[in-house]
Design a protein with these regions (language model features):
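Class II aminoacyl-tRNA synthetase catalytic cores and aaRS-like
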Residues: 1-600
Length: 600
């Protein structure tokens, strides 16, 4: 993961410049530049130390940092009490300075103290990063957990990311427009949260899983460039990178090409990255979907390391080696930390089988007694010298390397090898930095349904590649879409596409998907009706703010960059949500809980 950035630079600077109310200064503004000045500071007691009968040292923490205060009295104080201290800034005695703090050269001495609020014993230390309790305890007391410097930094960094995105897009002429939170059901793939209507009994709104259709309607409405930092809801199974409610940057623009859209997003993400980490001038290379699958076995490859996959089927065609004489033979040099033991190789074979492969072949490159290269492999006796030489040359292998290979159908081999490559690379290599990648030219369709109709890879409004229109009905799985994904360190940040604005093309896509005119009008009638009034060519993109913030903050889970997240089972441990509601409230919506649900 990316090393954590210094927290909240811009927001803290704004605070330091604008103290108000009960305080004259924030903690981090109490420096050697104001020695001799009288100041008042407010915050929480981070620690308290008594020296003798008449001296108390307090570390006062506020939202900007910590400052040491010296009270010439012995007072009963406890951690996390809220206090106000008034005193004079003086230089710390020699040898007691703390160079890690902005205020570490000084202290507030001869101070008077006012207790603003007492606190119960906290369930865990706010200052301790190592010995944190179970995440459930942290989420139950999230208001305490959020006092920790790491989470304070994360939330502030996230705010800077949003600020940078807004500034970047508005420099391109984008307009921030809010779209409805109560929306009509649309089949966009994920399960939606339903909201009953009290005034229209028996009818329901849904909470939007994305503003996809709304933003296209804005293009028809003549708003040339739209964006929104949008709250979205999906009632789906949760994991480390998912929440029921999430935030995404949503963007749409008229009269643009996909290159234009990628330029907008590249600049916005670059600016957000610089705001969060200080890094600038990062590269955003692009590869096609087919190239990504062929070289990395994934449509979201982690390019922080090489170890690319090479095709070897031509080398073994007609060789008679059954395990290798297959339509596709993919191979890569396994990322290693030290030497692979035989037991580790056996584990990799089992892992490949668990991923769906018939097996996994391995070749350990070694030097023979005569200086030539040889291989240690379960099928070594079947390999000719020219096979070994070509494997070494094609993959760039050297003595000690282990080559892993899977044979079979192309798509299946690449899927297994891509997973192994990612798992081994992240486990065995020191991966640092941020590596963005655009993946373009995705398939328009993925697989066939039970009726033999192609399944839309994204949504049915994605524009096909102009060169592939003629394949729509003859070979739909070969049709490429004008769609594109942005990947960071092997994580898909978001995706976008050029949309269909031509009713004829839209009709053809619906027909290819097996969607009749009647069903299309039932599902999307209001959008299709709008397109009949003049729709501009348009395209857009959306990416997850939560995921981007987690990656830029060096966190493994998005829960660490969300103020009040749910658990992986969708519970809010702090508030107790979700909860039952009163029977009369249910009745006002025309709802009742069935007996089977009561027992569930």
């Amino acid at each position: 993961m990316q090393p954590a950035p210094t927290f909240g630079r811009d927001s803290v600077q704004c605070l330091l410049a604008n103290p108000k109310g009960l305080r004259s200064h924030y903690a981090s503004a109490v420096t050697d530049e104001i020695i001799g000045h009288e100041v008042s500071v407010c915050g929480w007691i981070a620690s308290v130390r008594e020296h003798g009968e008449h001296l108390t040292f307090i570390d006062l923490r506020d939202s900007t940092g910590v400052v040491q205060c010296v009270i010439s009295d012995r007072i009963e104080l406890h951690p996390e009490w809220v206090i106000r201290v008034v005193g004079r800034v003086s230089k710390r005695p020699g040898g007691t300075e703390n160079p890690t703090l902005p205020s570490g050269q000084v202290e507030i001495s001869d101070a008077s103290l006012e207790v603003l609020s007492k606190a119960n014993a906290v369930p865990f230390s706010v200052s301790d990063q190592k010995d944190l309790p179970d995440e459930g305890v942290r989420l139950r007391y999230r208001f305490v957990d959020l006092r920790r410097a790491r989470l304070q930094r994360n939330i502030r960094t996230r705010a800077q990311i949003n600020k940078a995105i807004r500034h970047s897009l508005e420099s391109f002429g984008f307009l921030e427009i809010e779209t409805p939170m109560l929306w009509t059901p649309t089949p966009e793939g994920a399960r939606e949260f339903s909201v009953p209507s009290r005034l229209q009994p028996g009818n329901f709104y849904v909470l939007p899983q994305s503003p996809q259709i709304a933003k296209q309607l804005l293009m028809v409405s003549g708003f040339d460039r739209y964006y929104q930092i949008a709250r979205c809801m999906r009632d789906e199974d949760l994991r480390s990178d998912r929440q029921f409610e999430f935030t995404q940057l949503d963007l749409e623009a008229s009269f643009v090409t996909q290159e234009d859209v990628r330029e907008f997003i590249t600049q916005a993400v670059s600016d957000a990255t610089q705001a969060a980490t200080g890094q600038s001038n990062l590269a955003f290379p692009s590869i096609t979907y087919r190239e990504a699958i062929a070289r990395y076995g994934s449509d979201k490859p982690d390019i922080r390391f090489g170890h690319e996959i090479f095709e070897l089927s031509d080398l073994f065609a007609g060789s008679g080696i059954r395990a290798l004489d297959q339509p596709s033979v993919g191979a890569f040099i396994a990322p290693a930390k030290g030497e692979f033991s035989r037991s580790k190789l056996d584990q990799l074979v089992d892992r490949a089988k668990a991923l769906g492969a018939a097996g996994l072949l391995w070749f350990r490159i070694k030097q023979g007694t005569d200086g030539s290269l040889e291989v240690d492999s379960p099928i070594a006796k079947f390999l000719k010298n020219e096979h070994i030489a070509e494997i070494v040359t094609r993959l760039g292998a050297k003595t000690g390397d282990v080559v892993l290979a899977v044979s079979g159908e192309f798509k299946a081999t690449r899927s297994v090898l891509g997973t192994l490559r990612t798992e081994l690379g992240r486990a065995n290599l020191e991966l640092e930095g941020l590596r963005y990648l655009w993946v373009i030219d995705f398939p328009m369709f993925e697989g066939l349904d039970d009726a033999g109709n192609p399944i839309a890879a994204h949504h049915p409004f994605t524009m096909p590649n102009a060169d592939d229109f003629e394949l729509m009905f003859s070979d739909p799985l070969a049709v490429r879409a004008q769609s594109y994904d942005l990947v960071l360190n092997g994580w898909e940040l978001g995706s976008g596409s050029i949309r269909i604005h031509d009713p004829k093309i839209q009709s053809d896509v619906f027909k290819a998907l097996g969607i009749s005119d009647e069903v299309a009008n039932q599902r999307f009638g209001f959008l299709l009706d709008a397109f009949g009034f003049g729709a501009p060519p348009h395209g857009g993109f959306a990416f997850g703010i939560d995921r981007l913030a987690a990656l830029l903050c060096g966190e493994d889970t998005i829960r660490e960059v969300i103020a009040f997240p749910k658990t992986q089972s969708g519970l809010d441990l702090m508030t107790g949500a979700p909860k039952q509601i009163a029977k009369d409230t249910l009745q006002s919506y025309g709802l009742a809980i069935s007996e089977s649900q009561k027992k569930a």
